[in-house]
Amino acid sequence: VEIFNYCESNGYRYSRYADDIYISSSDYLPIDVKDTLYKLLQKYTFGINFSKTGFHSRKSRRKVTGVVLTSNGELSIGFSERQKIKKMLYTYLVHENGEPRKILGYLAYLKDIEPQTYNRFITKYSSYCNTDVIDALQEKCKQDN
């Protein structure tokens, strides 16, 4: 609460997810503010990973807890994660090699973050199995039980 209050009273935004803490501002944090924040974090036994500490503008790629915030403010799973899902789908549907449950999990993640991309993938990859790709994966999961 003390860190949150300090940030709020100085015009900064404090966000936390598990052990990841984010201090957001429209500009670089002044040295005295950084020093105060470091002291507060240490007071509450938070370690600081300086390799993950930095300034990210709207022009740079911002990845927070595995989700990319694009320059236009949209959420994305990122190019490499999309490629991974494509590869898993193709490998499973064409070569029958892969883990259907894992693929379904990745597709659920994609659907939450990028629903339009999810719909494109479902349409595209359903043509590989002549049915709905989700139905095909779920059916395989039932058979494996």
Could you tell me what each predicted segment is?
Residues 2-5, 27-145:
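Right-hand nucleic-acid polymerase module
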